[in-house]
Amino acid sequence: MPAERAYVPGMSPPALMTAEELLHVRIPDKRVELVRGVLSVREPAGYTHGRVAGNLTLRLGAHVERTRAGQLFAAETGFTVARGPDTVRAPDIAFVRRERLPDPDPRGFPDLAPDLVVEVLSPDDRPGAVLAKVADWLSAGTKLVWVIDPMRRVARVYRHDGTESVVAQDQTLDGEDVVPGFSCPLASIL
């Protein structure tokens, strides 16, 4: 692992990391992303987070496999959503439509915005950081972002066209035109 970069007043700021350099970073038992060239390190997801993400992955995965709509990506798959400085985000679940899948599979973190991104909130998530992730996904071209809040038992839906909505636990998550035909009662994954 490269030496940690430190900033001392009066000196030049530390060099920014690239998506390619991030491939070589190994921090056991941590989740990492690259945000505008700066390494972001987080604790592993907790029990509730993993359960909710797993429940939705099973339902969404069954639909994607049955319809052959595209490819589902598991938690912590990195996608390069900006260059210069680089930003590599790793959602809890991502879906890319079949016609947009790169061929052959790219090495590393592809310059590709998933069509659907799912973020499951953890107790330590800060609202500003979550909204920054949503903004990064949408500006990169993601069409639909679901932010699921297990504690409040709601999901916030953000769309590329700028519209937003809230799904209560007694309502249904809908794949809209991004994952056609997919719907899932929110309560069934919480």
Question: For the regions a protein language model found, what residue spans apply to each?
Answer:
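Gly/Pro/Ser/Thr-rich low-complexity, intrinsically disordered segments predominantly at protein N-termini
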Residues: 1-190
